[in-house]
């Protein structure tokens, strides 16, 4: 895992088209902004896992 340090307002690049910007830090919460092309899905991990679980459940019931 690559670990990077960024301050509020600083950005990191993921590939050529995705940027992740630190918008704010308050206590143990970090607000980030993600700019990505429409064809790149961006989800919180727990939402992504739910989507994957629903996809696999749909496949089993078909």
UniProtKB/Swiss-Prot annotation:
Keywords, in A-Z order: Activator, Cytoplasm, Repressor, RNA-binding, Translation regulation
GO MF entry, a single one: mRNA 5'-UTR binding
Function: A key translational regulator that binds mRNA to regulate translation initiation and/or mRNA stability. Mediates global changes in gene expression, shifting from rapid growth to stress survival by linking envelope stress, the stringent response and the catabolite repression systems. Usually binds in the 5'-UTR; binding at or near the Shine-Dalgarno sequence prevents ribosome-binding, repressing translation, binding elsewhere in the 5'-UTR can activate translation and/or stabilize the mRNA. Its function is antagonized by small RNA(s).
Keyword tRNA processing applies: no
Subunit structure: Homodimer; the beta-strands of each monomer intercalate to form a hydrophobic core, while the alpha-helices form wings that extend away from the core.
Similarity field: Belongs to the CsrA/RsmA family.
One GO term (biological process): negative regulation of translational initiation
GO cellular component: cytosol
UniProt name for this protein: Translational regulator CsrA
Subcellular location field: Cytoplasm
Predominant cellular place of this UniProt entry's protein: cytoplasm
Disulfide-linked positions: none
Domain of life: Bacteria
